[in-house]
């Protein structure tokens, strides 16, 4: 893989995690009027490209050097993902549950979305730790990604035997929101990434022109606005996501050329995974504190935009300190990601 493409994937991954934090900072239940509509537009449309991007990049990297899928390749990839995905999932899931449970024990009114924790039975505890994490709900992505790696031979076989038809079938399931165990969005975009890695590596290296990127950006905004009144929401929303991803992918090329690569390898990109796993429940706590100061819809909107900046800043400070003074701990909780 070229240095250009490697840096591009890291930069887009960092942008995606920033969008995830903005997505999770929404305060729609407290909002109305212009504040509500702006948050709805950003939360339900613009920031939604972040999760598919993560899955796409993960699928691309998983299959990038795969010439043929055999038992040795599968065991090697699964072993690496146990360290990089499963171990961090368990650590952060247990930590998130412990934090929320402890805070609710001291302040029962905190974390209103997690009622009845004190009544949990063994099955509830296991589900909260292994399937639907409490406090760190964003870990569902890590869970689904590990499951996608586990079924990678099926995805590989589908692409090799059915080729583009396999992608079409997954697209249809996604457009019509047909779900089963693993999110269909997870499976689809991991598979798209795998398809590109197996068949179109050179296309991923292609530098997009400013004209095509501008057109994609305009169309993306049109589709985002169109979503609100369209009776075929899933289809239009899905097409908007694809346009948005294509736009951001090409936008990197434009920014790289315009800035002479100034932002191609920023040091903050190395903390993407830590921000992802650490931003909750920190973000919920920050929003709860700031909401007590909000006196108007303008105040709520300011919280919506300022909370992500504050939380990302906290995450970066904590990541740097942890990596500096406890490098082994940092590597373990981040799945070996130290660079």
Question: Where does each model-flagged region fall?
Answer:
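Membrane-interface junctions at the ends of membrane-embedded or membrane-associated helices
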Residues: 2-3, 65-76, 157-162, 198-211, ...
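Interfacial loop-to-helix transition and helix-capping segments at the boundaries
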Residues: 39-51, 130-144, 174-192, 207, ...
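Hydrophobic transmembrane alpha-helices
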Residues: 60-64, 148, 152-156, 186-202, ...
